[in-house]
Amino acid sequence: MQIRIAENGSQPPHLTRAPYHTALKWVPKDADMRQIDTPMPVFMTQNAFIRMCAHAGSDLDNEVGGWMAGKYCRDSLHGTPFVIIDTVLPAVYTKHGAAHLTFTGDTQVALHNHLEENYPQKDLLGWYHTHPRMGVFFSQWDTWLHQNFFPEPWQVALVIEPHQSIGGLFIRQPDGSLDQRRYFGFYELTNRNQGGIVFWHNLQPASIRNEQSQEVINS
């Protein structure tokens, strides 16, 4: 049973301002990784980050994963696309092992129903999964799954390696290409009264240029 799970791509993006002013930018520590700018800004709430890390640590021997949802947006000032990940849906009924994760037909039905019933106004932004003891990269199977089930240019993937506490995002280039070895950081949406909580050892905070942005989430 196969279900195409990227069904909301025809929906127009939310027109709003990107929330740079409440975000902490995280970039790879590897200088070579930083040579290419992020193709599309990805903002992530602290709650979403914590939930994915908790799921990643729930099974250190086998791959686990799920969906990421939130809002697909277009900056009302600059016209550039960006996404805000604020909802995490851990996958159920998967087939998994130390080096593989399969979203079965039952997985896709359960996740899709959960998204529609509980978060009808949210967009399916992509998926996340772990690579226990293997590092942060995209395998051939990961690439096939991403291209076939998350084909929209604004849909992204997150890979977490829980043993080393490292992770990174895989984001398509404007021409649609996807480098299986090059990952990107993200913008952590922070609480005004506290700092960042990202603890991955392969990312570091970056100073952010004045990006002249205002409010976003409540649009």
Predicted regions and their residues:
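Conserved beta-strand-loop surface patch within small alpha/beta domains used
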Residues: 1-124, 133-219
